[in-house]
Amino acid sequence: MLLHIPALFEKDEVRRIREALEQADWADGKITAGYQSAKAKHNLQLPEGHPLAKEIGAAMLERLWKNPLFMSAALPHKVFPPLLNCYTAGGSFDFHIDNAVRQPKGSIERVRTDLSATLFFSEPEDYDGGELEIQDTFGTQRVKLPAGDMVLYPGTSLHKVNAVTRGARYASFFWTQSLVREDSQRALLFEMDGAIQQLTHDMPDHPSLIRLTGTYHNLLRRWVEV
């Protein structure tokens, strides 16, 4: 399942974040890549623990845990602290699959990467190229969203960032360990939750609503890992 989550940040917030990122001291993006990924990765990144990365990451997490679309689709258990990257002219990240487990720097906590996400901080017209290209059961999708918008997709997906040929592409990326490991089960629960919410709006007194809600929670009980 690939999901577009709009307006996690408002435009004025994005502008302030981008201005701060433009003034930041960036490091080689290979610092967080695995052995295979490092050979394919050509970008810049704020080091883990960088004050600006921590500030932006905390603001992102605050919004994510309050976002109904993210909560319904991801069913989050743990979220890896968001990282920040920058692609300038010539920057790219060839096809790869994210590591299955990530460990934040200085932490004993481990996060299984069930879901990957990218939050865009540059407007599409500010750079050429730089599309996030994702291959999975839903086919091949090229994603280049407005600043402040986010895309959520399975961590098992083969994906790349196409070369930037003009401008700069600022973004955040992170991973989520879901309460439900299997993507097809999460997709089913997401569809069911959406149907329940729509039915609640259209026919709040319908007798089937309680039964459908009960079925949703019984499926959660069967599939959730805590």
UniProtKB/Swiss-Prot annotation:
Q: What is the lineage of its organism?
A: Bacteria, Pseudomonadati, Pseudomonadota, Gammaproteobacteria, Pseudomonadales
This protein's record includes keyword ATP-binding: no
Annotated residues for binding of 2-oxoglutarate? R169
Binding positions (Fe cation): H96, D98, H159
The EC number(s) attached to this protein equal 1.14.11.-
Name the needed cofactors: Fe(2+); L-ascorbate
Give the matching HAMAP family.
Answer: Hydroxyl_YbiX
Q: Which UniProt keywords apply?
A: Dioxygenase, Iron, Metal-binding, Oxidoreductase, Vitamin C
How many and how are cofactors bound here? Binds 1 Fe(2+) ion per subunit.
What organism does the UniProt record list as the source? Pseudomonas fluorescens (strain Pf0-1)
Q: Name one GO biological process term.
A: DNA damage response
Query: Could you identify this protein by its name?
Result: PKHD-type hydroxylase Pfl01_0799
Q: Does the keyword Mitochondrion apply?
A: no
Q: Residues in domain Fe2OG dioxygenase?
A: 78-178
